[in-house]
């Protein structure tokens, strides 16, 4: 096995004494830093490389801190108006994962970069920490490489805002296999609409 395989196995055993100590110390370190800061290198090089990261010019890593828990509806003094069934304020569950929220915040902060992917690096009782891989699409090393030219196209601007990253697609229910049958036809709404529309074709 190569070195990255050993690292992967280490990260799979998060309850081991070594990893518990490491994650605890790192969470303390991350809490002292700002909620969005640039990391000099990936904390998990094996995971970052599997997601497309290369240790060369044009690739940037940002570490994001996201507060855990549900989403409180932003209404003044809980005044939601309307019928009591829609009066919920506190027990609201956000439709997207905290990982996709972290990607969105990184994309907003670094508007000139493109979000490639992200991965989990730690959590405590209050926060979750993710590292986001961003790409500078105007760097010659990116534009001249056939493997990364696809992300330089304008259609990939702010892909994290439109649910086109891996974490975003998971929240949209998109994927392959029997687990994703609710989105056959493009999206949950398209699948529901097709299954709930009566079509009476003309007999010819």
UniProtKB/Swiss-Prot annotation:
Component of the large ribosomal subunit. The ribosome is a large ribonucleoprotein complex responsible for the synthesis of proteins in the cell. Its main location: cytoplasm. Coiled coil: none annotated. SMART domains: Ribosomal_L15e. It is found in: Cytoplasm. This is Large ribosomal subunit protein eL15. Pfam families: Ribosomal_L15e. InterPro entries: Rbsml_eL15_core_dom_sf, Ribosomal_eL15, Ribosomal_eL15_CS, Ribosomal_uL23/eL15/eS24_sf. Keywords: Cytoplasm, Ribonucleoprotein, Ribosomal protein. One of its GO terms (molecular function) is RNA binding. Belongs to the eukaryotic ribosomal protein eL15 family. GO terms for cellular component: cytosolic large ribosomal subunit. GO terms for biological process: cytoplasmic translation. The keyword Cytoplasm applies. Component of the large ribosomal subunit. PANTHER family: LARGE RIBOSOMAL SUBUNIT PROTEIN EL15, RIBOSOMAL PROTEIN L15.
